[in-house]
């Protein structure tokens, strides 16, 4: 157990992945670095879309009230970590956990845990996120290291997203992303990449993109919001794709520059 800020007051809680307070509806995870919250507005737009669709009004944190955020971040007392905002019908809970080191290059591993059907499209980031947690459990059971991200497919066999990340790849001069119909989340870092990559965008329903020139793992808590991929293996560990991670550098740099302009300090 740790301390969380619940409705503006410090309380006992648990901000670890997979642990949610009773009544949790939606959540967002954000990076806190050097006292600044990264891309807060992007996360809150997605959160409010879910609340609006479910018929709930946003509280001060979900509404982006600067004074509420400054107070909550101050109460938690950290300058670096992963902030998790969880909202329910009658509460907002902001927690802070450690920001673990992130690999510069990922290896992908196909998983057998299928992406479940979303409540609606575009998919809301709803608690308790049980399907992604099951995918993460499967990935850990394979005995892989921290530099491996699991990939979920929908029931038709199309690439959906990573167990903790969004996916995108460059192929034939275009940025390819899984279509929303695969059940993937509208990831915040993915949305930013779409806007700043400078490439035509194709939303696709496809299996493993074996002709991709570069593949990216996108996650809001990664430095710069993304990392490159070097290999993609099937569920049994057999190779499906490999590439030079350096080819992803132009898009990683563009995304990092975009995100650097969207940090808010509550110090």
PLM regions with names:
Residues 74-81, 143-144:
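Short secondary-structure junctions
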Residues 1-63, 68-71, 88-267:
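Helix-start/capping segments and mature chain N-termini
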């Amino acid at each position: 157990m740790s301390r969380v800020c619940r409705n503006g007051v410090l309380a006992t809680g648990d901000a670890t992945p997979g642990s949610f307070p009773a009544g949790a509806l939606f959540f967002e995870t954000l990076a806190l670095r050097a006292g600044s919250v990264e891309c807060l507005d992007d996360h809150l737009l997605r959160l409010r879309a879910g609340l609006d669709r479910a018929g709930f009004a946003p509280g001060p944190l979900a509404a982006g009230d600067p004074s509420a955020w400054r107070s909550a971040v101050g109460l938690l007392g950290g300058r670096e970590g992963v902030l998790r905002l969880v909202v329910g019908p009658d509460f907002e809970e902001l927690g802070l956990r450690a920001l673990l080191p992130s690999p510069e290059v990922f290896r992908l591993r196909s998983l057998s845990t299928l992406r479940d059907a979303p409540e609606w499209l575009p998919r809301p980031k709803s608690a308790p996120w049980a399907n992604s947690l099951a995918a993460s459990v499967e990935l850990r059971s394979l005995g892989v290291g921290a530099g491996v991200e699991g990939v979920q497919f929908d029931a038709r066999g199309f690439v959906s997203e990573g167990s903790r990340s969004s996916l995108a790849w460059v192929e034939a001069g275009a940025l390819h992303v899984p279509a929303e119909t695969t059940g993937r989340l509208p990831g915040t870092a993915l949305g930013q990449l779409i806007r700043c990559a400078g490439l035509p965008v194709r939303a696709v329903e496809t299996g493993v993109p074996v002709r991709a020139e570069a593949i990216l793992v996108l996650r809001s808590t990664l430095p710069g919001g993304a990392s490159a991929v070097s290999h993609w293996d099937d569920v049994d560990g057999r190779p499906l794709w490999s590439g030079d991670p350096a080819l992803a550098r132009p898009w990683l740099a563009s995304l990092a520059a975009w995100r650097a302009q969207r940090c808010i300090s509550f110090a």
